[in-house]
Structure formats: structure tokens, C-alpha cells
């Protein structure tokens, strides 16, 4: 029996992730026999959910959110032994990894493009006890990312990071 976990950050994209959740669930239900959906409520949830799914033998973990949700999910899969296929739908402010991979920024288009038979291998790095898949930053960048509020991201979009710097 093929199983897939969907992790949704309901505040990503000003609540856009919640709006597209059913579309993603429907699409993945055509590819997997069992779908489980979990909504994050705070920091660390996506990591915990992904790790648990891998440990329970799920075939895939998809997340819907921004770069932070993607990073947390990748960390959970890594901690779970890299045993799951990973997919994501970009619904954040910047969506850096999806841009690098050529994934459509429009969630509907990204969902339509999901094909479990067309996967790619991506490199995963590790720094201390954290994993990363797209970039790693030091100095002012992580400080700025931490300081930008969800309200600022919602109102200003990517400009919020520039103004905080």
C-alpha cells in the first residue's frame, strides 16, 4: 500500500497554502493509496511530521509552504533516514528552492505538474546538526530572515527582507 504525508503550513503565502490544500490532496490521491494531511502550528512541526512519516514507512512526504517549511521537511526526512520521496508546492514569500529547480511559482500549475514517476535527485548538505538543500547563510542574512514578521511578508512580499537589511 503506497502512503503519502502532506504537510501544510497554513500561514504560508498569507494563508494561500490552506486554499490549495484540497487540490494537492486530490492530485496525490490519484498517485497514492493513502493520504495523510497534517497542518503545522509552529516551528519544528514539519520536521517532526516528516521524520515520523519516514520512520513509519511512508513512501513520500510532500509539503506546501515557503522556504522555511521546505527546510524543516527536508530536515525531518534526513533525520528519518532519507527513506521517503520528497515533493513540495511553493506557497511562500520567496520560494528560493522552487525557483532554482524550475518549479512553477503558481501553486495550481505546480500541483498539476506533479508526476511521481519523474523524480530528481537533489544534493543535501549538513552544517552541525541541521541539513540544507538549497543554500546556507551566515552573517546578517539569517538575522534578517528571523526578524521579518509574517505581517511584513504578507504586506511587502520579498521587499520585507530588503527593508530589514
Indicate where each model-derived feature is located.
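ATP/NTP phosphate-donor binding region
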Residues: 1-61, 75-76
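Catalytic core of DAGKc-family lipid kinases
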Residues: 31, 79-165
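Helix N-cap/beta->alpha junction signal
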Residues: 42, 65-66, 137
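Short glycine/serine/threonine-rich phosphate/pyrophosphate-binding segments
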Residues: 46, 68-73, 96
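Glycine-rich beta-strand-to-loop/alpha-helix junction loops that act as flexible
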Residues: 10, 64-66, 91
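A glycine-rich beta-strand to alpha-helix segment
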Residues: 59-64, 68-69
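Short, glycine/acidic-enriched loop or turn micro-motifs at the edges of active sites
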Residues: 12, 70, 93
Amino acid at each position: 500500500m503506497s502512503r503519502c504525508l502532506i504537510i501544510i503550513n497554513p500561514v504560508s503565502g498569507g494563508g494561500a497554502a490552506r486554499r490549495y490544500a484540497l487540490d494537492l490532496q486530490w492530485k496525490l490521491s490519484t498517485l497514492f493509496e493513502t493520504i495523510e494531511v497534517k497542518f503545522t502550528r509552529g516551528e519544528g512541526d514539519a520536521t517532526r511530521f516528516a521524520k515520523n512519516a519516514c520512520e513509519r514507512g511512508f513512501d513520500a512526504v510532500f509539503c506546501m509552504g515557503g522556504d522555511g517549511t521546505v527546510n524543516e521537511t527536508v530536515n525531518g526526512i534526513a533525520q528519518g533516514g532519507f527513506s521517503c520521496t520528497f515533493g513540495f508546492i511553493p506557497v511562500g514569500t520567496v520560494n528560493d528552492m522552487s525557483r532554482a529547480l524550475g518549479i512553477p511559482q503558481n501553486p495550481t500549475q505546480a500541483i498539476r505538474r506533479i508526476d511521481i514517476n519523474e523524480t530528481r535527485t537533489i544534493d543535501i548538505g549538513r552544517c552541525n546538526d541541521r541539513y540544507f538543500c538549497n543554500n546556507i547563510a551566515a552573517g546578517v542574512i539569517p538575522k534578517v530572515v528571523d526578524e521579518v514578521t509574517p505581517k511584513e511578508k504578507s504586506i511587502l512580499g520579498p521587499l520585507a527582507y530588503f527593508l530589514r537589511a
